[in-house]
Regions:
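Forkhead-associated
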Residues: 66-139
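Short, highly charged, low-complexity non-transmembrane loops/tails of multi-pass membrane proteins
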Residues: 54-60, 559-572
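Transmembrane alpha-helices of multi-pass inner-membrane enzymes
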Residues: 120, 125, 522-563
Length: 572
């Protein structure tokens, strides 16, 4: 079959009009990518910010204060979810929590005036609708929203398939994939493998979309961006190393399975909280095993070999790290929780330093800063963390020659174009030679340079597919990050908000390090571009990260990571 297909393509390639068509495709790909990205961005970024009201607090003056999250910090401070301007109420007084089954609890978080439920003082108590909650001597009653209010609230909320239908966007992506497959088959030798890989990719995305529709989920924009970036990644592998396509298909299928498993886990907050400690412990044990039994490649001991399979544990640990950092509001108010997270982060970064994996250590550290700020809001603590890490960084550069060499060539690659700056100088030349629209699939030169499909993948895409498409790859990650920024304030739980922000931070920092490292604006750290760089461990991880972003998506019927009601209802 492979020989027949190759013979047909050889005959077709002799046709003059087909060569012209092949050249014209270079201008079509950026246009299709732009249409896909604009449609996804419009759906993800233009929705109305619609807070959900879950209950009311009836005050002593008869006013009704909305309770708009599952976890609500109550106090006199302006940063509280429910602000009560009474002198006897502390700045941070209590946490009012809703659970999956509709029950409520109230917890004292070290207030001066105390918390009472129906006249009895308590540190934590179950609260039912109609119960009186006394905060610093001021009484409030928990009141449910009416069925009519619930119906109106559901009716006015944005549906992700309103103005921009995800099926149409997916059709544009499928057209992009078919045309990319055709061009790759015309420009590369492994035609059968290329056709099979793109066929599997298209099948997986439509099967996932069909599964969503069966489950009454209409939001598919985040997943469409992931499939778009994965398509570009498949195109890179087809051109550079077609033998790796089978591995990438398996990794993609595994990543989607992990994504769905994490979505199922996160849709039940109590289940996610129970798994948190086990997953966190697994992450640190996995890195410790990597330190002891890891295999060194390209100067970093960040690989493990299990028979014929090699993988990077640090990629899997990113998901474990998010589980460790995410926490409910009630636990965030305790010092013990903060201390444990700082110790966990230090242990992770320490293991990465021992493995010489400083690129991944940077990702974890920046994610730690974002997570720590969301947990505490304390800039002084962050400043101390940055200062301490800066001192540790100086020691690392002093005693780790490998890391020092990476920094020594930074901003001096053209002076070392034949030695330590070889890869980056060739990458920048290939970006320039590709121009805006690229040389065409399989016609680039960068594939002959080491790590061109991983560390230098931005330049690889720019050379063969054009700088416009390479920039749109970066824009796709930016759209995901912007969506998280808009979604997090509306998150039902701080667990979901912190998880989504941490996942987006990892994706953004990886993208920045990969792109800026390629063009010598930052040191080349060997960090992959999310979804695009060749690597099964990386692809598995980034699909897992998407689950945390989907868990913070509270648009109407948008996310598989958010429970729907009974079959007879249409809203969440």
């Amino acid at each position: 079959m492979q020989e027949v297909l190759a013979a047909v393509l050889d005959t077709v390639q002799q046709t003059p009009w087909l060569r012209e068509f092949d050249g014209a495709l270079r201008y079509v790909f950026p246009l299709l990518a732009l249409v896909i990205l604009i449609r996804c961005a419009k759906s993800l970024l233009m929705f109305r910010r619609e807070p959900e009201v879950w209950a009311w607090l009836a005050g002593p003056t008869g006013d009704h204060i909305p309770v708009m999250h599952w976890e609500n910090l109550i106090g006199r401070g302006r940063g509280c979810d429910v602000t009560l301007d009474y002198p006897t109420i502390s700045r941070t007084h209590a946490v009012l929590t809703r659970y999956d089954d509709g029950s409520w609890t109230v917890s004292d978080v070290g207030s001066k005036g105390g918390v009472c439920v129906n006249g009895e003082e308590t540190a934590m108590s179950v609260v039912a609708f109609g119960d009186e909650i006394s905060l610093g001597g001021v009484g409030f009653t928990l009141v449910p929203i009416t069925k009519e209010q619930e119906r109106i609230q559901a009716a006015v909320r944005t549906r992700p398939d309103g103005e921009v239908h995800p099926a149409v966007t997916l059709l544009f992506l499928t057209l992009f994939q078919i045309l990319a497959c055709l061009q790759l088959m015309l420009g590369c030798e492994e035609t059968g493998a290329i056709a099979g890989a793109f066929g599997a990719l298209i099948a997986m995305q439509w099967l996932l979309f069909g599964f969503y529709r069966m489950r009454r989920r209409s939001g598919f924009d985040v997943e469409t961006i992931a499939f778009f970036l994965s398509t570009v990644g498949f195109a890179v592998i087809c051109s550079d190393n077609p033998a790796a396509l089978k591995k990438e298909i398996v990794a993609m299928a595994g990543g989607i399975a992990l994504f769905l498993a994490l979505c199922w886990t996160l849709r039940d907050l109590e289940r996610a909280k129970k798994l948190r400690y086990a997953v966190s412990a697994f992450g640190i044990l996995l890195l410790m095993a990597n330190v002891l039994f890891g295999v060194e490649k390209f100067g970093a001991k960040n690989w493990m070999q299990l028979g014929p399979v090699s993988f990077q544990p640090s990629e899997i640990v990113k998901i474990c790290f998010i589980f460790a950092g995410a926490s409910t509001l009630q636990r965030l108010m305790t010092k013990r929780n903060h201390i444990l997270f700082i110790a966990y982060s230090a242990a992770i970064c320490g293991c990465l330093a021992l493995m010489n994996d400083f690129g991944t250590a940077i990702i974890f550290f920046v994610t730690f800063l974002v997570t720590a700020f969301m947990r505490s809001g304390d800039f002084a603590t962050l400043g101390l963390a940055v200062a301490g890490t800066g001192f540790a960084g100086v020691l690392v550069l002093r005693f780790k020659p490998y890391a020092m060499r990476r920094f020594a060539v930074w901003r001096h690659v053209w002076e070392n174009a034949l030695t330590t700056g070889y890869s980056q100088t060739r990458a920048m030349m290939c970006i320039a030679s590709g121009g805006l629209f690229g040389l065409g699939a399989g016609k680039g030169w960068l594939k002959y340079v080491a790590a061109s499909d991983t560390d230098l993948v931005f330049a690889f895409v720019a050379e063969e597919w054009g700088l416009l498409l390479a920039v749109l790859m970066v824009a796709a990650v930016a759209v995901l990050a912007a969506f998280v920024v808009r979604s997090v304030p509306l998150g039902r739980s701080s667990f979901y908000a912190i998880g989504a922000a941490s996942a987006a931070t990892i994706l953004v920092v990886q993208t920045i390090l990969n792109v800026f490292g390629t063009v010598d604006l930052l040191p080349l750290t060997g960090v992959t571009f999310p979804f695009v760089s060749n690597g099964g461990s990386s692809l598995l991880c980034v699909w897992g990260l998407l689950a945390f972003i989907k868990a913070a998506d509270t648009r109407q019927n948008a996310s598989f990571a958010v429970k729907l009601p009974d079959r007879g209802e249409d809203s969440e």
